[in-house]
Amino acid sequence: MANYSTNDFKPGLKVMLDSNPCSIMENEYVKPGKGQAFNRVKLRNLKTGKVLEKTFKSGDTLEAADIVEVEMNYLYNDGEMWHFMDPESFEQIAADKTAMGDAAKWLKDDSNETCTIMLFNGVPLNVNAPNFVVLKVVETDPGVRGDTSGGGGKPAKLETGAVVRVPLFVQQEESVRVDTRTGEYLERA
């Protein structure tokens, strides 16, 4: 496996630290007036999500992490695992609740949504839902005429269980387009 020197450190680089895969979030090169130069690095542990700060002397190396990002289609959830399939090879992978994170509330069974899955040694570490999804509103308060002062919104429960704020004109059984990164309503579908 390749090694990265402190000169190669940049945000987004995936490295191994204490036998855990990490992603570099920030890298600051420091050259004090006296003494050896060093790098102050902020890393996110990809297994636990914890952020840690480490200092490396100039010239230190870290091993590259065996991380692969693949695009896969979502198939179904069997209660404890979410199942995905590679559209070319038809290979299937199952991700647990920790790997799914927030993506679980945006995916519905048989939707065939394309997700980006981060694999470490063939095991899913993280699943990113598509940026935009279309879901049906299953529960929301009716919009009453004249209820528009301030242009506010109302909460709406979607078919996956997620709750988003929608404009007052959105009714039950309508489909809405949602940005999964922010959890915000975009438009009626």
Swiss-Prot record:
GO molecular function, one term: translation elongation factor activity
The gene coding this protein: efp
Source organism, top-level taxon: Bacteria
Protein name: Elongation factor P
InterPro entries: Elong-fact-P_C, NA-bd_OB-fold, Rib_uL2_dom2, Transl_elong_fac_P/YeiP, Transl_elong_KOW-like, Transl_elong_P/YeiP_cen, Transl_elongation_fac_P, Translation_prot_SH3-like_sf
Xref: CDD domains: S1_EF-P_repeat_1, S1_EF-P_repeat_2
Modified sites of kind N6-(3,6-diaminohexanoyl)-5-hydroxylysine: 34
Keywords: Cytoplasm, Elongation factor, Hydroxylation, Protein biosynthesis
Entry PTM: May be beta-lysylated on the epsilon-amino group of Lys-34 by the combined action of EpmA and EpmB, and then hydroxylated on the C5 position of the same residue by EpmC (if this protein is present). Lysylation is critical for the stimulatory effect of EF-P on peptide-bond formation. The lysylation moiety may extend toward the peptidyltransferase center and stabilize the terminal 3-CCA end of the tRNA. Hydroxylation of the C5 position on Lys-34 may allow additional potential stabilizing hydrogen-bond interactions with the P-tRNA.
Record's function text: Involved in peptide bond synthesis. Alleviates ribosome stalling that occurs when 3 or more consecutive Pro residues or the sequence PPG is present in a protein, possibly by augmenting the peptidyl transferase activity of the ribosome. Modification of Lys-34 is required for alleviation.
Gene3D superfamilies, per database record: 2.30.30.30, Nucleic acid-binding proteins (2.40.50.140)
Entry keyword Amino-acid biosynthesis: no
Compartment(s) of residence: Cytoplasm
Keyword Cytoplasm carried by entry: yes
GO cellular component, one term: cytoplasm
Family of this protein: Belongs to the elongation factor P family.
BP-aspect Gene Ontology terms: peptide biosynthetic process
Pathway linked to the protein: Protein biosynthesis; polypeptide chain elongation
Pfam families according to UniProt: EFP (PF01132), EFP_N (PF08207), Elong-fact-P_C (PF09285)
